[in-house]
Structures are given as C-alpha cells and as structure tokens.
Amino acid sequence: MADGLDIRVRLDGFDRLVRSLDSVDVGQRTRLFLDGVGHLIVSEARLRAPVNVGLLRSSIFHEVDQQEPPRYVDVGSRVRYAPYMEYGTGTTHDHPSWPKVRHIPFVNRDEDGRPVAALFWYAKRKGLGFGGGYAIARAIAKRGGLMPRRFLRGSIEDLRGRIGERWVEVRDGISRHIAGGGQA
C-alpha cells in the first residue's frame, strides 16, 4: 500500500487444515470467519482511533483475501497520516524500521503564500487562537514527536483471545461435519 496503514491477520496452521478437507466448503466458512474478524477489529479500532474531524476513524476498513480458500484479512486505513497516528513519530515512535529522529512539525503556506504552522487549523478549531498551532508544534518538537496511538495493533492484541475462540469454533464445526455430525 503506497499511503496509509495496513496490518494483516494471518491464520496459522490453515494450509494443513485445508489439505485434510475435501468434502466441506472450507472457503465459505473461512471467508465468513475472516469477514467477521475484520468487522470486529474495525469496530474496535474505530473506537480507539484519534479523532479530529473523523477522517481517520471513518477510513478504517477490512478486506478478506480473494483467493479460495481465503487465508487472511487485511485491516487498515488509506489515510496518509494513519501510520504516524498508529506508530507515532520522531524519537517516540515504536515502528521497527523508522529512524529515531526528533519530529519538528513542518510549516505549510496559506492561500496567500504566508507561512502557517501545520497545526494552526487544528488549534483554531479547538479554540486555541492564532498562536495555538505554534504552541502545539513546539510541544511536539520538545517531546520529540507524536506518541504511538496503537489503535489498530492494540485492537488486535486485545481481541486475540476472542478471535482465537471463534477460529476454534469454526475448526470444530468443520471437524464435526467431516466426522459425520452434519452441519455445524
């Protein structure tokens, strides 16, 4: 993905399970399971996502693998700044491959070409006045960067148990079907 953030949830042991099955529609059951997992993670991530105007929160999506049977679900956001909200920036980030360099918010230019702090419009919406954007930028620079918000990774970590339980239910239902227990 060129812009945005994408985290993949992969099913361990899935290939072994598929090889042992011929009589069951594993693809359909797995697709329903992964779609449900995607919805679950998206719902939790939207609750955790930082909100300014709601663009990041509303952009969180999930997409199930298109191959048959599906093996993963992607959950992410195509908003350009999503990775920086997830991992943080500067010296405070927790991304495994980004350099630890102090983050100093850049300067944008307004319609007339005058320099305006990148956070000026945010500060104005929050009622902090003209100097508010500069004060926020200064605080970010002093701290070294934005702190990680972990809205996606935190959701996956907290839901790991529920996802595992659901996968066991799907797996056991398939096993019962194969053993002659009928539809599960």
Model region roles, listed by residue range:
Residues 1-184:
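Short, Lys/Arg-rich flexible segments
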